[in-house]
Every structure is written in structure tokens, then in C-alpha cells.
């Protein structure tokens, strides 16, 4: 199988108090997540962000919970955080998702960009 080295997503904006599935594994694909860039757009408050690797639920996207959370990050005002595990996070099953939760209560969103490889 060939690897497509790419941004796995466009820049996603995740609103306050919401969760967004930013990467979903397609049929017969393997996804390797190398980095997640998270930027806090708020100039006055730290935003807490949760990263979830959520297994599929009968072939479709599952729901994030405390059992799927792999990181919780407090991103400072107007700051950017790079989540770069030593080895890529591998998602193999159709419908597996990377979900980002913005716990913020402010009105400001965060921006998220995911990079890695897609086996095609």
C-alpha cells in the first residue's frame, strides 16, 4: 500500500463547548496521525482542549468519553500547542475518529490542524 503524506484535514474551527470529529477513517484505509496543532483564538482566557481517539460504533462514528480521551491540554491565550506523540497514533477501522473537544465556556473557538499519513 502507498502512503499519502499530507495534512489529514483542513484547518477546523471548534466552537466553545463543542466536540468535532476532525478525522474519520474510511473503508480499507489506515490513518497515521503524526501531529495535532491547536491554536487558541481567545486573547483573554485559557481554553481546555480534550483529544479523543474514538473507535467506530457498528461501522459509524462513536461518541467521545473518558475512556477514549488520550490528552487534555490547557492552551494559553493566543497560543499554539503541538501534540506530537513519539510514534504515530494509528487508526485502522472504518469509522474510527479523532475527535477534538473545546471545553471552553468563552465564545471563542480554537483552530485545529492534523498532519500525518493515509495508507491508500
Describe the residue ranges of each PLM region.
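Short beta-strand/loop motifs in extracellular/secreted proteins, especially
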Residues: 34, 45-50, 108-110
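Intrinsically disordered, low-complexity Pro/Gly/Ser/Thr-rich segments with frequent PxxP/GP/PP motifs
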Residues: 58-96
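C-terminal interaction-tip segments
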Residues: 1-31, 41, 55-57, 94-95, ...
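Selective for proline/serine-rich intrinsically disordered segments
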Residues: 8, 53, 83-86
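Short edge beta-strand/loop segments characteristic of extracellular beta-sandwich folds
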Residues: 37-39
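Short structured motifs
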Residues: 19-21, 35, 82-86
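Short, surface-exposed beta-strand/strand-loop-strand elements in extracellular ectodomains
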Residues: 43-67
Amino acid at each position: 500500500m502507498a502512503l499519502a503524506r499530507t495534512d489529514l484535514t483542513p484547518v477546523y474551527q471548534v466552537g466553545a463547548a463543542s466536540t468535532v470529529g476532525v478525522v474519520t477513517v474510511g473503508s480499507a484505509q489506515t490513518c497515521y496521525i503524526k501531529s495535532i496543532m491547536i491554536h487558541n483564538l481567545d486573547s483573554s482566557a485559557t481554553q481546555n482542549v480534550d483529544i479523543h481517539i474514538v473507535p467506530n460504533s457498528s461501522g459509524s462514528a462513536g461518541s467521545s468519553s473518558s475512556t477514549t480521551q488520550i490528552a487534555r491540554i490547557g492552551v494559553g491565550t493566543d497560543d499554539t500547542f503541538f501534540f506530537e506523540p513519539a510514534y504515530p497514533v494509528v487508526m485502522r477501522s472504518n469509522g474510527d475518529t479523532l475527535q477534538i473537544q473545546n471545553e471552553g465556556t468563552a465564545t471563542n473557538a480554537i483552530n485545529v490542524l492534523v498532519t500525518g499519513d493515509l495508507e491508500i
